[in-house]
Regions:
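Short, conserved beta-strand edge motifs with alternating hydrophobic and charged residues
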Residues: 89-95, 124-125, 145-146
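Structured C-terminal subdomain patch of bacterial secreted/periplasmic proteins
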Residues: 47-59, 66, 70, 83, ...
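Basic- and aromatic-lined ligand-binding clefts that recognize polyanionic substrates
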Residues: 63-117, 209-219
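Conserved beta-strand termini and adjacent loop/short-helix elements that scaffold enzyme active sites
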Residues: 39, 93, 124, 173-175, ...
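Second-shell loop/turn segments in exported
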Residues: 12-15, 37-42, 54-67, 97-104, ...
Length: 219
């Protein structure tokens, strides 16, 4: 939760947050002369774009702001267009607990992001939840894991039924890259796409049937 006392001590004109602020704290901020802008946490790339546009509008005005937002997001949108159809099907998994799998579902930012590359097999699931049965049935071409999750966390019986394991199409990636969506996502999108298309093998190191995507110096 935001430290309201510390924020008030800094005396900003405007507080921008994606975290809910309690009513009593909203009153305190107002009494201190601090305006409050709450932006929704994006659940899709389009909503992320909208947040940038809203911020640009506030600080630069509607006309100049639209241009500023487009310039800021140009590289990300270019990376998205370049990455489309990098694979046939994909899934991003954050946790495994028996048959229950936490994944980037269609109603999440992570799910929408990975849908850029190909069909997200969890796109029709919600609340970050899918199952081992659904995973086996869909048999995604590529599986991405949120570190520290690795191939060894998969039950051997489950892994044997997924072609991504036998074809070395299992990769791990820093989950914070999808949890804190920023314009730097362009680098992540390109790295993931290059791994699947084989255009930058230096970003990966295969170990035990899967590979870790190394962060670039710009991330």
């Amino acid at each position: 939760n935001p430290d309201i006392d510390k924020i008030i001590s800094y005396a900003p004109e405007l507080l921008i947050t994606q975290s809910p602020i309690a009513n009593k704290d909203t009153v305190r901020l107002s009494e201190a002369g601090i305006s409050l802008l709450t932006l929704p946490a994006p659940s899709s790339l389009e909503e992320l774009y909208d947040n940038y546009a809203a911020l640009a509008d506030i600080f630069a005005g509607s006309i100049e702001g639209n241009s500023l937002a487009e310039n800021t997001l140009a590289d990300m949108k270019s990376a998205v267009n370049e990455a489309k159809n990098s694979c046939e099907s994909i899934v991003f998994i954050m946790n495994i607990d028996g048959d229950e799998i936490t994944a980037g579902t269609g109603d999440s930012f992570a799910g929408d992001l990975f849908s850029v590359f190909g069909r997200n097999i969890a796109e029709n699931d919600t609340d970050y939840t899918t199952t081992a049965e659904e995973l086996i049935k869909a048999d995604p071409q590529y599986i991405f894991l949120a570190r520290p999750l690795s191939a060894s966390d998969f039950d051997s019986g489950l892994a044997e039924q997924l072609s991504a394991f036998s074809e070395d199409h299992v990769f791990s990636i820093d989950a914070s890259l999808t949890e804190r969506p920023t314009a730097r996502l362009a680098e992540t999108i390109r790295s993931v796409s290059e791994v699947m298309t084989g255009t930058n093998a230096e970003t990966t190191e295969f170990t035990g049937g899967y590979a870790e995507i190394h962060e670039t110096s710009g991330q």
